Amino acid sequence: MTPTASSRDASYVLTLEEIGNLAKNAGKPAETLMNVVALIAKRFQTDVCSAYLLEPDRANLVLAATVGLRPQCIGTLRLALHEGLAGLVAEQVRPVAVEQVKTHPRFKYFREAGEDAYQSFLGVPLIDRGVLQGVLVVQTMAARAFLDEEVRMLTEAAAQVAPVVSEARTLDRFIAPSQERLWSLARNLWWSWDQESSGLFLDLDPKRWRQLNHNPISVLGEIPMSQIERRSGELVLHGRINYAYRRQREYLNADRTWGARHAGILRPRPVAYFSAEFGLHESVPIYSGGLGILAGDHLKSASDLGIPLVGVGLFYGQGYFRQHLDGNGWQLEEYLQTDVSQLPMEAAIGTDGAPVMVQIETRGGAIRAKVWRLKVGRCDLLLLDSNVEGNAPEDRELTSRLYGGDGRVRVRQELLLGVGGFRALRAMGVTPGVLHLNEGHSGFAVLEAIRSRMQDEGIGFDAAATRVSREVIFTTHTPVPAGHDRFGADLIEEHLGPLRESLGLSHEGLMAIGQEHPGNGEDFCMTVLGLKLSRRANAVSALHGEVSREMWAGLRPGKSEEAVRIGHITNGVHVPTWLAPQMSRLYDRHLGAGWHEHSAEARIWEGIENVDDGELWETHLSLKSRLLDFVRRRAMDQAERRSEPRGAILRLGGVLSPDALTIGFARRFATYKRANLILADIEKLALMVNDPKRPVQFVFAGKAHPHDEWGKRVLQQIAELMRNAQFADKFVFVEDYDINVGRHFVQGVDVWLNNPRRPLEASGTSGQKVVLNGGLNLSVPDGWWAEAYDGLNGFAIGTGRTHSNMNVHDTRDGDDLYRTLREEVIPLYYERDHDGLPRGWIKRMKRAIRTLGWRFNADRMVMDYTLKCYVPAAGGTSSDMRMKL
């Protein structure tokens, strides 16, 4: 039966009012849901109205309430998102109306539901607070062409129903509360830095947890439902689930945060934080190295502090490469496709209720990208994905890998990140008050922001650029000129020509924005763009600030380096992410209640001096033992994969002594990091590692860029030591360096070795993670260590002298490294008292924790950005950090 035009509006409006009343006066959510679908069927004059809910795995729909279909199917009728018309609605997150269902290619007949009599179908998504909850469906026996107005009104009805559905999914009988709460924990990366939550997933199935790369969505998806039901019903585990879930809710809903007190101006217009990569957790492989890890830590601390901030990046379908070494120690690269269904991501929904899709015009055609949304605590991370229908094959591959391809691929990736990222924000109704560019890769976002301001306010380029630049923060990480992205004029015109025209700029005018000396034929430099179109620019350590001001002095010819107003905010690390559980419990006992929320305050860390030396040392030895077990296990797995003899595999199970001084090195095998500096004098090294009274051993990990032959040769040098009789038990290289490997290393080493060629390390953060866990740094005074080392909180390689001759520089540093090991590090480690404790070493551990723990953590870093950059850029109180004029 089709409603008449005269009855349609009144009946629909009444339906919306009554749905609101039902939701307001709800008893049990499931009962309310049944009443709602009955009311909709009556008012829309349809024969069927059904509500399908997404199951916790978000891969299937389950029939939750119906009028017209067989009631015994409630809770039992399931369909995957790729099945049927209801699945199509959920998959595309948009309404689907079909007059004759049997003619549609996605039609699927569910006999048990008794739906063979129904011909027409209208389904709309149920969305609550931007999250898809399920699908609302009406069906009729007679063929019916649903009008646009009817689709709109059912969509509005669904908006009223969605909150009821959201509550029902958690509380009602067809989805067990404990299971739903586990899925709720898994779908927000907050679990990754909450030790109680990650421990829950480990305890559900320890073997699967390790095999599935610590991915809770994969674990929950693979564990049989009966096992989850049985385990979650155990009294102790049930209580832990409820406790973790309650803490997550309290965390997400907290309003008394540091950000609420100090960054309220950002709430209506948040910070948009752009980065080419984000290192959040090993199970989300969209990072390659330090830049991504820093970005991930920045988001996590912004979440903890309550800073209104949205991350913007790219979704790399194959991530960075997986590393294996062949029998000769040569690096091999393998790229694996990431299964999106195993990640805690959902399609980003725009203000129009549809999935966000952005499009960027170039001279060669349009590039399109869909947008994923990932929850990082209180913060959203938007990830653009070019692997969509309608793109040319080369464009579908744009976001497949990090840092792959030539300059043409790179400029297209950066166009997608900057311009596409800004458009994605606007499509979601986010108008950022601050743009923070984490390196130059995202610099095109500023040009798009200027275009948008010109259009919104009806002003010209110069006026718009002036206004936008006040809101831009630019962070540079690269201390060498060759490391900055540069693109030729032809590439810029091919890809930015349409944008340039909308900005009202000539080709020369656009190129000048990215040239240090306009008009001399230079390529377009992304860092120059960032420096010119930002009010505030910063380096990432004090020394790096000096290097950057010298490097970019040409931007202010005739002025002193000090006139190049690049300030610095030294990097820090997210304490909960990198702190071992054992050390966290030790701090809980001795630093005072709530120390986590005040970790950027020096007074908190003074409590480390009250820790008993024996307790601290035993905690460290426990972590060291865990590291060595991990390294042995990985070494055996590597040998087995290479089909090495059984005896050789078993021998690896006994390498590395828990009593030996253990030095760790894990990072990119870039040339300037000099991973092989310790090999400068192989005879001295052999004597050192084989000293029967004071032995030293090394654990290494790291990746060389696929195109870096030098880096691969250095890596091979180190790997070959595992087959050298002099070093076989004292050197182990762990393949496939990732966040998991890094976490084990920084939590368990005695000494962290860092020997870059000064001043080429912008900051570095791995040594900061070591400090938190009781390890000591042995480093060239470069990057963060140049301002951190006080003579008693670690060890320095040399005095910071440099030399224009690289060979002289390296030889001098190599000699200083051996001398420091021989005269300072090794004697102090092995000097024991009558209790067997290295009191001098422990004293240095405590001093490192006390003097560095508060200074070099991401909470302090994000607080600095907020007070010195974000708030002033948004129009708040000015800062004392250097402002770029």
Question: Which residues make up each language-model segment?
Answer:
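Signal-transmission linkers at sensory-effector interfaces
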Residues: 1-31, 42, 133, 164-171
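Short beta-strand-to-loop transition segments that serve as allosteric relay/switch motifs
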Residues: 69, 135-144
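Acidic/proline- and glycine-rich, intrinsically disordered low-complexity segments
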Residues: 71-96
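A short, aliphatic-rich beta-strand micro-motif
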Residues: 119-127
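Helix-loop-beta substructure at the N-terminus of cytosolic sensory domains
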Residues: 23-64, 73, 83, 168
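Catalytic cores of carbohydrate-active enzymes across secretory and cytosolic contexts
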Residues: 171-885
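Allosteric cytosolic regulatory segments
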Residues: 155-162
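Signal-transducing coupling segments at domain and membrane junctions
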Residues: 71-72, 99-120, 140
